[in-house]
Design a protein with these regions (language model features):
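Bacterial N-terminal signal peptides that target proteins for export
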Residues: 1-7
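N-terminal signal peptide c-region/cleavage motif recognized by signal peptidases
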Residues: 15-17
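Bilobed "Venus flytrap"/periplasmic-binding protein-like clamshell domains
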Residues: 27-55, 59-60, 119-121, 125-200, ...
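Pocket-flanking alpha-helical
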Residues: 44-51, 62-106, 192-198, 206, ...
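A structural signal for short loop-to-beta-strand junctions that line the ligand-binding cleft
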Residues: 102-122, 254-263
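Periplasmic solute-binding protein
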Residues: 115-131, 263-272
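An extracytoplasmic/periplasmic, membrane-proximal ligand-sensing/linker region
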Residues: 200, 205, 210-222, 228, ...
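C-terminal lobe and pocket-closing loops
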Residues: 226-284, 320-321, 328, 332
Length: 336
């Protein structure tokens, strides 16, 4: 009987397929989306794709322009494999089918890696407008309801609208819709469009993401004096919690007009994959990034100051890992 059980167990082991070995140099094919046709996000994606192509010669890893919000839809519906600009905003809204998504996408995409966690939302106002309306803080805006021309992104770019400014407004007792009720208006577009509007006196307030110490913000401030909208860190944290972000303080001197620390929303940005993407493709993309840390950092921007292999498995939204990514992280002890 004992020998029969041993033989049966051995036969079962033979029958089970062994896990494929992905530790080879065979090429992979993938399309990465989520970045606009120009600017840093595209530079980031093109740089990461180049690392993968060099690690696995012959790979066809390409870039497909889109937006952060649109990128998640693309991978969920199988029109692209990865999106490289997702945050907690896109993850939650897509899972739940909230605007700008028309239906829940839960289960159609999964987590691959954190790319960086230092995307800071800039809450700026012109000194001229602030002085004219007696505004120093979010609380002042809530109580005085001033007419403002607000430069902000479009709501179909959720992370820099729904994911931060809208939530901070809610935390202080008003909403994005109140801006028009107070006699104000919007300049909708990316951060470059918004800063141009400040320079051209077409906007009074700017809410969007830029790197800390951004040269363009400094240049704008030299032409039209700026101030940071002050606030209470605990209240900002309440807003940040909605999408698994955190409140952080912008250090004194980050910009010439900052005489003290100011609170803001600090966001993380992640690479996601569609559920249709083979484990091998995801595993190899992850491995290429992890084992070429210095080269990834050399792409510049947020990757230079925040990307590390040790933090790739950090998953603030607790989105299920793609099996290919999870396999690599378990092999390296980054996930239990």
């Amino acid at each position: 009987m004992y020998f029969a059980r041993v033989l049966a167990a051995a036969a079962l082991l033979v029958a089970l397929p062994a896990a494929a070995d992905f530790n080879d140099k065979k090429p992979i094919n993938a399309t990465v989306t989520g970045a606009t046709p120009s600017g840093y996000p595209r530079t980031m994606v093109e740089g990461m794709n180049a690392v993968v192509r060099d690690t696995y010669p012959g790979s066809a890893v390409s870039f497909k322009p889109n937006s952060p919000g649109g990128g998640v839809l693309e991978i969920a519906e199988g029109r692209a494999d990865f999106t490289a600009t997702a945050t907690g905003t896109e993850v939650r809204l897509a899972n739940e089918g909230q605007s700008p998504y028309s239906k829940p996408l839960k289960g159609k995409f999964s987590y691959v890696m954190q790319l960086y966690d230092n995307q800071f939302i800039h809450f700026l106002m012109t000194k001229e407008w602030a002085d004219a309306n007696g505004i120093k803080s979010w609380a002042d805006i809530a109580s005085k309801k001033p007419r403002m021309r607000l430069a902000i992104n479009r709501p179909d770019n959720p992370q820099t609208t729904i994911g931060a400014p809208y939530e901070v407004m809610k935390a202080y007792g008003f909403s994005i819709n109140d801006i028009e009720k107070w006699g104000g208006s919007y300049v909708l577009g990316n951060s470059s469009i918004g800063l141009d509007a400040i320079v051209d006196d077409k906007a009074d307030v700017f809410m969007n993401a830029r790197n800390l110490g951004d040269a363009l913000v400094k240049d704008v401030a030299s032409k039209r004096p700026l101030l940071w909208i002050d606030g209470d860190r605990a209240t900002i944290q309440k807003a940040a919690d909605a999408f698994n972000f955190k409140a952080d303080m912008v250090p004194v001197g980050t910009y010439p007009f900052m005489e003290k620390e100011y609170p803001t929303v600090r966001q993380w940005v992640a690479l996601l994959a569609g559920s249709h993407v083979p484990d091998e493709v995801v595993y190899k993309y992850v491995k290429a990034m992890a084992e070429n840390e210095k080269r990834v950092q050399a792409i510049g921007g947020s990757l230079k100051t925040s990307f590390t292999a040790a933090k790739m498995a950090v998953n603030p939204a607790n989105l299920p890992y793609h099996p290919g990514a999870l396999r690599y992280y378990k092999e390296k002890g980054l996930v239990k």
